[in-house]
């Protein structure tokens, strides 16, 4: 069977209506891209996945939205990330991408922690806020007085203790893994 017909059949089977006159593919090559999707093969057969180009674009847009320059107030940044990620996930929700979503989700949690860490600016503020969030004083002093960069500092035990996933979700973070599971179940 021709790969292009197979691609249309798989995408139509997953409830995406494809207008045949507008989207026609004559052949499929190794990194075949069709409406942002690609086909993969594993032991169970053929599956739909996201092409690498949209992945790069998605990550660069998230990087731009969670930039340290933009993070003056974290709430508007979280809202913009939520709007963009929700739209992207709703479009690409039929694709199999659980591992990639988990990787980007962990990276995005780290970016948000870094933005919050940068907002605190002074070591005294960092130590005080960590202690308020329930971190032991000695760990808070170590993390708050570090002279390493923002990215390194948010890898410390103290910062991860203070800003857990649950706390970030309660403050408005859009968890990509949870959203992907709820979207992907519907297909």
Predicted regions and their residues:
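Non-catalytic terminal/accessory segments
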Residues: 1-187
């Amino acid at each position: 069977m021709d790969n292009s017909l197979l691609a249309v059949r798989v995408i139509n089977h997953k409830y995406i209506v494809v207008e045949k006159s507008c989207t026609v593919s004559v052949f499929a090559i190794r990194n075949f891209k069709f409406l942002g999707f690609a086909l993969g093969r594993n032991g169970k057969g053929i599956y739909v996945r996201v092409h690498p180009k949209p992945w790069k674009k998605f990550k660069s847009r998230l990087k731009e939205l969670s930039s340290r320059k933009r993070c003056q107030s974290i709430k508007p940044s979280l809202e913009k990330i939520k709007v963009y990620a929700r739209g992207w996930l709703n479009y690409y929700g039929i694709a199999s991408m659980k591992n990639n979503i988990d990787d980007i989700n962990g990276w995005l949690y780290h970016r948000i922690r870094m933005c919050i860490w940068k907002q605190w600016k002074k070591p005294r503020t960092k130590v005080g806020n960590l202690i308020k969030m329930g971190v032991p004083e000695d760990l808070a002093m170590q993390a708050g007085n570090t002279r390493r960069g923002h990215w390194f500092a948010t890898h410390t035990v103290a910062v991860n203790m203070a800003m857990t996933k649950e706390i970030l979700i309660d403050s408005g973070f859009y968890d990509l893994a949870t959203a992907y599971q709820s979207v992907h179940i519907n297909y």
